[in-house]
Amino acid sequence: MPGKLKVKIVAGRHLPVMDRASDLTDAFVEVKFGNTTFKTDVYLKSLNPQWNSEWFKFEVDDEDLQDEPLQITVLDHDTYSANDAIGKVYIDIDPLLYSEAATVISGWFPIYDTIHGIRGEINVVVKVDLFNDLNRFRQSSCGVKFFCTTAIPKCYRAVIIHGFVEELVVNEDPEYQWIDRIRTPRASNEARQRLISLMSGELQRKIGLKVLEMRGNAVVGYLQCFDLEGESGLVVRAIGTACTLDKLSSPAAFLPACNSPSKEMKEIPFNEDPNPNTHSSGPSTPLKNQTYSFSPSKSYSRQSSSSDTDLSLTPKTGMGSGSAGKEGGPFKALLRQQTQSALEQREFPFFTLTAFPPGFLVHVGGVVSAGSVKLLDRIHNPDEPETRDAWWAEIRQEIKSLAKALGCHAVVGYSESTSICEEVCILSASGTAAVLNPRFLQDGTVEGCLEQRLEENLPTRCGFCHIPYDELNMPFPAHLTYCYNCRKQKVPDVLFTTIDLPTDATVIGKGCLIQARLCRLKKKAQAEANATAISNLLPFIEYEVHTQLMNKLKLKGMNALFGLRIQITVGENMLMGLASATGVYLAALPTPGGIQIAGKTPNDGSYEQHISHMQKKINDTIAKNKELYEINPPEISEEIIGSPIPEPRQRSRLLRSQSESSDEVTELDLSHGKKDAFVLEIDDTDAMEDVHSLLTDVPPPSGFYSCNTEIMPGINNWTSEIQMFTSVRVIRLSSLNLTNQALNKNFNDLCENLLKSLYFKLRSMIPCCLCHVNFTVSLPEKEINQGTSTASPKNFDKKQALQTTKTPVEKSLQRASTDNEELLQFPLELCSDSFPSHPFPPAKAVTVERASPVGDGNFRNRSAPPCANSTVGVVKMTPLSFIPGAKITKYLGIINMFFIRETTSLREEGGVSGFLHAFIAEVFAMVRAHVAALGGNAVVSYIMKQCVFMENPNKNQAQCLINVSGDAVVFVRESDLEVVSSQQPTTNCQSSCTESEVTT
């Protein structure tokens, strides 16, 4: 057999009382894997049983090891009746199948019951012995690593980035089977949890097979989603970017590659910049001095068609992005054609990554998105999901054609989402059209002289802003100006992207969170009529969301959006649209023009006075925002030395649309951006409401900043420990006043209150920045709106933020260490012997900085100690892909968990707030326990992808489904690394320090 699974049940603690007569429990354990079940002996009359069982051995195929979860069921023995279930534990075996990962899973796992929640803990030890299998027709993909992070993982080197992989599996939902009418809610929930866990494992295995066919060994930017289609079935789908990664193991290569962004952000990388308000976008990418290789498509057979891209391009060390010279050079055109042909040989040239090494992106065209409304049908054959595959293939093909229309051959920052209500499903996909770096192809057609000629052009840090399309045949109306940095190429007046801010971008001032929120009523209908009504509403919602984003961006005095995420949610009688992004001022783009209001009735004196009053308020708001975010761009003058400025009246013919005359000539000049060209015309009540919503947008309190990207542009010096907050709010709408205006107000209040609750809890951390603010909205029932938000607050040194020159590492770097624990909003309570019964304070926003249920003794047999100074391992959780003040030394595998919680005593458990708070706390406790059992001490790239709440107040019932994922890692603090490095020989210390300084 290719694999042997060994399980040992050690002990239990804090079990619930199951025998009312003795106030004790007669507990035993069932261990099940596949169709094989083992049982322990019954431990009589104890709430802390000590089974210390023998090793239970399962001889299984490696395919089953990937698909099946290990099920551990704790029961109470009853002599004369059926045994009572206490709870279950599902353990994913996949992290043990990596050659570099943990060798054993050992620790205390919370025993979870879908009705009662966590009911004690159980100590389990799991081992796997794998045999070499050289069968070329095998159906397993053991050894393929999965990463949730949307950047190349720390401590790894990207050899080849192959491209897009996708897969989906379908099945019937146990909640809607006929047997569900006669079985208990607990049995139904457990059947659903087990099926989802099984489908998740099967999905990872199938994607791993595609990666192996592409000669890769990892999937980065792995995004898995569950589509609960009701009676139609259950769909689990995933997308990712296939890569070939190499582990950096030597100390000389490892230390600079794993530098925490906290260290790199605390310096301003561009010390030659004369503008004091100009900062780098963030840390230098850890892969700056590494080799990336994109190989043209290889000729090998494929067993099945997959949507992937196998391109191979290798930027050399130190090459910046951008077209530093003229765009139309014959050599660059030749290389661009070669890269484009290599990309076009694959079906979908998509990348789920959002952060890239310098030089990877040559041009960014803008956001491309596509959507479709589908009518769900029953899944007749779970083994043949052609219908859903065809739906997504249509969406991806449209995305590809839109990118091509923008003059781009790839899509980066790609993501997919769905929204389902009854029989209607909205499929959405979005990404950023881009041109990837065509230099240094490995096909042998590029000679050294060409490379040397290309290397003569120095990077300008503005190339990704230059338009990739032909300005004489633009795909859409746009205002173009010459780049404010190089003065050679054309740039748009505004730039929208779904990726993180490139590391080599030049930003003026600070960034901020910008949101567009919209609600629209729709008539309640069924089947095709409902789908038609939604299809008719969608274009208008998308247009209004885009208009809101544009208006708010100009109101902030900024000219670019990064990390754009648009979510369209459908309910029974309404549609909701939410767009979140981080606004910045790019130095290469023109200064945004103001917002001018125009009315339809110029003869009305009072109306004109009202218009002028609003115009004054808008102008004052723009001025205040520029002062708040320190946006002070330098004046453009022709006396700047070394910057050739083109003629201000250079002729440029722009074809704005098919209906306009081709003889129209638009003259562009550098002062174009300073004109008030953006006009808001007030011609009805809705337009007036839009203007009022702009002016009533609540700014963050003094000392607070927020963004939805990992790094706040313009802030480079983090000083605090890592924390994460999660908030869930549910509001019930009144059916009496359901109008568009009332819906919009309620939706705005929901989002604002989520942010205000975080600001209030973090008021002692000022100055504070909320990073990676992630919003999710849903309409679980007819008159219920639900909002979920997660954020990672971080302190920064305001005095150092005002420094304008690069300072030495010793002066500018303030490492996050245990000395900063007084900055934690909730201090850690370390307890190794007992698991806290109430692991979170009674607040609606949940902090995850709590003690792990596993002590330090459970970190044995690991390659690296997680925390040398602490006596108890505290499992940290963060939505960021890094940990400030620390270096990630090892990735232990992906954490992907799905939980269901149901109650029939909602009021007794504290109502909706108490029920949701307790459930989220239990989810965090179970995630931390699984990570600690693997030997990890942190979860990075954490995301709560689904939180579906349903209630029946009349029956005092409620149900909630939560899906979370992240990367389990081992990290070591930089202070600990310094102690280790100081004990090394002097020569090694000097060499490592030199390389570290070069990296930062």
Swiss-Prot record:
Tell me, which GO biological process terms does this entry list? insulin receptor signaling pathway; intracellular protein transmembrane transport; positive regulation of D-glucose transmembrane transport; positive regulation of protein targeting to membrane; positive regulation of vesicle fusion; protein localization to plasma membrane
Phosphothreonine PTM sites in chain numbering: 317, 601, 666, 807
Q: Report keywords, A-Z.
A: Calcium, Cell membrane, Cell projection, Cytoplasm, Cytoplasmic vesicle, Lipid-binding, Membrane, Metal-binding, Phosphoprotein, Protein transport, Transport
Which Pfam families does UniProt cross-reference here?
C2, YbjQ_2, YbjQ_3
Q: Where does Ca(2+) 1 bind?
A: 19, 26, 76, 78
Enumerate composition-biased segments (Gly residues). Answer: 319-328
- Per the record, the domain of life is Eukaryota
Q: Provide the record's note on post-translational modification.
A: Phosphorylated on Ser-197 by active myristoylated kinase AKT2; insulin-stimulated phosphorylation by AKT2 regulates SLC2A4/GLUT4 translocation into the plasma membrane.
Under Gene Ontology molecular function, one entry of this record is: calcium ion binding
User: Where mainly located?
Assistant: membrane
- Entry keyword annotation includes Membrane: yes
Any binding details for the cofactor?
Binds 3 Ca(2+) ions per C2 domain.
Query: Where do Polar residues bias regions lie?
Result: 274-289
Give start and end of each C2 domain: 1-109
Composition bias type Low complexity, residue spans: 290-318
Q: Does the keyword Transferase apply?
A: no
Phosphoserine found at = 197, 200, 260, 293, 295, 304-306, 323, 643, 657, 659, 661-662, 671, 817, 852
Annotated positions binding Ca(2+) 2: 19, 76, 78, 84
Q: Where is this region: Disordered?
A: 265-330, 639-669
- Which cellular component terms (GO) are annotated to the entry? cell cortex; cytoplasmic vesicle membrane; plasma membrane; ruffle membrane
Tell me where it resides.
Cytoplasmic vesicle membrane; Cytoplasm, Cell cortex; Cell membrane; Cell projection, Ruffle
State the protein's purpose: Required for insulin-stimulated glucose transport and glucose transporter SLC2A4/GLUT4 translocation from intracellular glucose storage vesicle (GSV) to the plasma membrane (PM) in adipocytes. Binds phospholipid membranes in a calcium-dependent manner and is necessary for the optimal membrane fusion between SLC2A4/GLUT4 GSV and the PM.
What the entry says about domains is:
The C2 domain binds to calcium and membrane lipids.
Q: What is this protein called?
A: C2 domain-containing protein 5
* Annotated source species: Pongo abelii (Sumatran orangutan)
